[in-house]
Amino acid sequence: MSNIHEHKILILDFGSQYTQLIARRIREIGVYCELWAWDVSEEQIREFAPNGIILAGGPESVTAENSPRAPEYVFNAGVPVLGICYGMQTMSEQLGGKVIQGVGEGEFGYAQVEVQTESALFKAIEDAVSETGKPLLDVWMSHGDKVSAIPEGFVAVAKTETCPFAAMANEDKQFYGVQFHPEVTHTRQGKRMLEHFALEICACAANWKPASIIEDAIERLKAQIGDDEVILGLSGGVDSSVVAMLLHRAIGDKLTCVFVDNGLLRLNEAEQVMEMFGDHFGLNIVHVDAENRFLDAMAGEAEPEAKRKIIGRVFVEIFDEESKKCVNAKWLAQGTIYPDVIESAGSATGKAHCIKSHHNVGGLPDDMEMGLVEPLRELFKDEVRKIGLELGLPYNMLYRHPFPGPGLGVRVLGEVKKEYCDLLRLADAIFIEELHKADLYNKVSQAFTVFLPVRSVGVMGDGRKYDWVVSLRAVETIDFMTAHWAHLPYDFLGRVSNRIINEVNGISRVVYDISGKPPATIEWE
């Protein structure tokens, strides 16, 4: 079996919204990489032993006092280094070049760079050719500051009209800097540049593939678990479903899946989960009906973070209780994925802020009696889905729209009550059904319904009704870090509204959320 971690790239994060995208692009190329905060120690880098290092972008100015710098060891480690945007600027400044603060002449958005000098990074890449026969590249810029003098040993590789050093290189040391963002799709040849860096310049083998990842995960699970038994909280979502299939392959009937019906699931979801994993795949599943327990625990609580923590705590309590029924259950498996780990870790410098606590990594008690098994903690969501397909899970389940770990607990605004959940389930099912019928479901990235704890006057026949309000939410996004509200057809929205008001007794008004992210988040809570 090939070692999927043998060749690897280290990405240092300076705070750019695009940093996770760099990691996903490197993984798509077939090379393992990890994303660390910029303030790592020499010892940590030596221990990781990367084949190459990428310095990512960031929002700060290299010219500002106390702005982040790459560890000096990065440039003495004897491996290729690629600086992107802020990463190029700090590389230049740290190696003896100069960076000047932008004064109203930054570049934001589409730009065309002209390649001046041959470089391993841009080998055989062009989108067009200039009048003088130089390759032109369509790229995406997002910078105010710029390099005004490159370090000794570097050459200017590319320029734009306002940026004389859009790319620089020291081919002897294999140090490269680009002022644009090769990781975004707007940079048309960006993936090829990253391929040149990872596969050719860093000489990494493309071992990071779904079948190899599965094989590696199964071997590691066997080594970690031994003859112990494992309990997994199976929700029917993508992450826990893929964990279930991996563990089933690794340890067979030593896996007990605990499916907790917390009363916060979608319509008929409990029945569907039991049918697929119990009847079809033959997993050992314990079905716990805990609706009242969750609702009682959340009674009177309206604050979103507190609700998330309560839901997480009650889940763990139930797992603890179920584990006591399995004499050898020493492990609790979770569907934690890599973005959860990144966002919850933050930086030692305190520059990362918690926007929402993650269901899988927040709220676990310190005295939890089981060890944690997290076979997906190295993987991005798109990788988890590809692995799920390889393991035989159905496409329509793996590519269903995201559903939050706390479920309807954060889609009912304020205090969660059974009545609200029941109404929301019915309204949401109508919305999703109509999206499928209109062939719109796969054209939006996420769609759902939110219950608003406000009443509104309505008229039904000759009678007046005073009932609840729901909001429809549909967004389009590539990475869920930014999103646009989906411009669904008016007649479609009208049809959904009419069906909900006529078929769901207790809802009198339907509204449509037209907020983007930012400033709003995709979920309301």
From Swiss-Prot:
Enzyme class of the recorded protein, top EC level: ligase
Domain of life: Bacteria
GO cellular component: cytosol
Residues that, per the record, bind ATP: S235, G236, G237, V238, D239, S240, S241
InterPro entries: Class_I_gatase-like, GATASE, GMP_synth_C, GMP_synth_GATase, GMP_synthase, GMPS_ATP_PPase_dom, NAD/GMP_synthase, Rossmann-like_a/b/a_fold
UniProt keyword list: ATP-binding, Glutamine amidotransferase, GMP biosynthesis, Ligase, Nucleotide-binding, Purine biosynthesis
CDD domains: GATase1_GMP_Synthase, GMP_synthase_C
Pathway: Purine metabolism; GMP biosynthesis; GMP from XMP (L-Gln route): step 1/1
Every GMPS ATP-PPase domain range: 208-400
S-S pairs: none
Catalytic residues as annotated in Swiss-Prot or TrEMBL: C85, H181, E183
Molecular function GO labels: ATP binding; GMP synthase activity
Subunit structure: Homodimer.
Protein name as it appears in the record: GMP synthase [glutamine-hydrolyzing]
Organism: Shewanella halifaxensis (strain HAW-EB4)
